């Protein structure tokens, strides 16, 4: 197990950092049966971000039809970069006889937090001073998995550049081509160009 953990984390740290700008870009009018959790899932936004964007709601457990909920959204250029990384990874996997990884928005959210954490706390490591290891971080965000891995990078300015860098590193390449992974999340922070890829197998 220790050997597997070392392999998963043996990704060479690529040094060369997009700030996740969140703003209330849209709104949702509550209908009967809605809960904050259902709204969060519908818009692929974390529950804590929805609560933060709606300070006017004193008790998030009690929302009523007709109430207007602000929906925070990630800057579109950020999400397009993240989705392009996923597309490129899946293209590589298919060329290598592997199945595509499924986009997991909750895993993308965790990966964004990791990239932001590296920027905010000025470190570049798989181990966060705030969240611990990638595995501890995923679990603390409610992500369940059978197997998991993480790739990080800093400084690459485009999805193609970061994927090329990862593919030229044996540890990163092993994660991208790991047949046991089934889902992927990518988080990008433009300010400093921090990148995080998180993989899980269920």
List each model region and its residues:
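Envelope-exposed proteins and targeting segments
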Residues: 26, 65-67, 148, 180-184, ...
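Short, surface-exposed glycine/acidic/tryptophan-bearing loops
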Residues: 110-157, 176
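Disulfide-stabilized extracellular recognition modules
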Residues: 153-202
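Extracellular LysM carbohydrate-binding repeats and other cell-envelope/extracellular binding modules
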Residues: 26-29, 38-77
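A short alpha-helix/helix-coil micro-patch that ends at or immediately precedes a cysteine
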Residues: 78-119
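Surface-exposed patches in mature extracellular/periplasmic domains of secreted proteins
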Residues: 60, 95-109, 122-130, 149, ...
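Sec-dependent N-terminal signal peptides of Gram-positive bacterial secreted proteins and lipoproteins
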Residues: 1-24
């Amino acid at each position: 197990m220790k050997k597997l953990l070392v392999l998963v984390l043996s990704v060479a740290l690529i040094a060369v950092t997009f700030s996740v700008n969140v703003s209330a870009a849209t709104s949702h009018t509550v209908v009967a049966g809605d809960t904050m959790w259902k709204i969060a899932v519908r818009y692929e936004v974390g529950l804590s971000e929805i609560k933060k964007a709606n300070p006017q709601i004193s008790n998030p457990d009690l929302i009523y039809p007709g109430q207007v909920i602000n929906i925070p959204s990630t800057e579109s250029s950020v999400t397009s970069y993240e989705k392009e990384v996923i597309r490129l990874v899946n293209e590589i996997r298919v060329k290598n006889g592997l199945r595509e990884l499924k986009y997991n928005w909750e895993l993308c959210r965790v990966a964004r937090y990791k990239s932001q954490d590296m920027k905010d706390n000025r470190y570049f490591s798989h181990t966060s001073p705030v969240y611990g290891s990638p595995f501890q971080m995923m679990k603390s965000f409610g992500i369940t998995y059978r197997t998991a891995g993480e790739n990080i990078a800093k400084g690459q300015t485009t999805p193609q550049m970061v994927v090329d860098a990862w593919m030229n590193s044996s540890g990163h390449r092993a994660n991208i081509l790991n047949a046991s992974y089934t889902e992927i999340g990518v988080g990008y922070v433009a300010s400093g160009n921090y990148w995080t890829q998180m993989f899980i197998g269920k």
